[in-house]
UniProtKB/Swiss-Prot annotation:
Pfam family, one: Ribosomal_L22
Family: Belongs to the universal ribosomal protein uL22 family.
Taxonomy, superkingdom: Eukaryota
Designated name of the protein: Large ribosomal subunit protein uL22
Keywords for the protein's UniProt record, in alphabetical order: Ribonucleoprotein, Ribosomal protein
Any one GO MF annotation of this record: structural constituent of ribosome
Length: 185
């Protein structure tokens, strides 16, 4: 079994999925993963479908130099956003795989949440491109590893009655006790 960067608090209530050496842009995939981190599974899948249809965009926060601006980024408080289709498809496949793993464990798919998603750089794949005057330049791709953990959310527990309790110090408790004794006598 491979080691994940994060461990879930309750392994019986979580399912994981991972992809290694995936031939998809590391930077785009990292931004896509950050966009859905902590979301419910159904919401994340719906959002990624909307990104593919260009109805919503992925906000680019870290790797955003030379990226055009779009109004669809306002939803996330950014101006720079894109629609990285290849990254979205890879993450959608992993979410589907994680959901299948969760259902095989007997977990409820409607309660699943993306509790951990991480994108790491894989070794670059090297090629070469031929330039003018007999020069040769590197032509590298930046693949990545993706891992995610889906966790079944616990039922919400109602808050206890928040009535104000009177807190007394030792001297006040002693005075109160003597007053009770006096009134009882």
């Amino acid at each position: 079994m491979v080691r994940y960067a994060a461990t879930s608090a309750n392994p019986a209530k979580s399912a994981s999925a991972r992809g290694s050496y995936l031939r998809v842009s590391y930077k785009n995939t990292r931004e896509t993963a950050q966009a859905i981190s902590g979301w419910k599974l159904e919401r994340a899948q719906k959002y990624l479908d909307q990104v593919l249809d260009h109805q919503r965009a992925i906000p680019f926060r870290r790797f955003n130099s030379s990226i055009g601006r779009t109004g669809q980024g306002k939803e996330f408080g950014v101006t720079k956003a894109r629609w990285p289709a290849k990254s979205v498809n890879f993450i959608k496949d992993l979410l589907r795989n994680g959901q299948a793993n969760a259902e095989s464990k007997g977990l409820d798919a409607s309660k699943l949440k993306v509790s951990h998603i991480q994108v790491n750089q894989a070794p670059k794949q090297r090629r070469r491109t031929y330039r003018a005057h007999g020069r040769i330049n590197a032509y590298q791709s930046s693949p990545c590893h993706i891992e995610l953990i889906l966790t079944e959310e616990n039922e919400a527990v109602e808050k206890a009655d928040d009535s104000k309790k009177v807190r007394l110090n030792v001297r006040q408790r002693g005075r109160l006790a003597t007053q009770k004794r006096v009134t009882a006598a």
